[in-house]
Swiss-Prot record:
It is a peripheral membrane protein. Could be involved in insertion of integral membrane proteins into the membrane. Keywords: Cell inner membrane, Cell membrane, Membrane. GO terms for cellular component: plasma membrane. It is found in: Cell inner membrane. This is Putative membrane protein insertion efficiency factor. It holds the Pfam family YidD. InterPro entries: Membr_insert_effic_factor_YidD (IPR002696).
C-alpha cells in the first residue's frame, strides 16, 4: 500500500504537476511534503499529515517554510 501511495504522488509530480503553473504556497511543496510524510510515518499518519497540509494550501494562508515534523503528536505522547 505504501509503495502505491508513493508511486501515485511521484506520478502526479512527473506528469500532472508540470501541466499547471507553480502555485504551492509552501516550502517544501505539498507533493514533496506528502512523499516525506508517507515515507517517515507510513500510509495512515503520513497521508493524514499530507491532507492537513493540503487543507492549508490556499490563497488565504500565508504559506512559507513548513517541513514534515520529526515526530507525530501521537509519538510525543509515548516518549518516556
Amino acid at each position: 500500500m505504501k509503495s502505491l501511495i508513493l508511486w501515485s504522488i511521484k506520478g502526479y509530480r512527473r506528469w500532472i504537476s508540470p501541466l499547471f503553473p507553480p502555485s504551492c504556497r509552501f516550502q517544501p511543496t505539498c507533493s514533496q511534503y506528502a512523499l516525506e510524510a508517507v515515507e517517515r510515518f507510513g500510509v495512515l499518519r503520513g497521508s493524514w499529515l499530507a491532507l492537513k497540509r493540503l487543507g492549508r494550501c490556499h490563497p488565504f494562508h500565508p504559506g512559507g517554510y513548513d517541513p514534515v515534523p520529526h515526530l507525530c503528536h501521537h509519538d510525543l505522547d509515548n516518549t518516556p
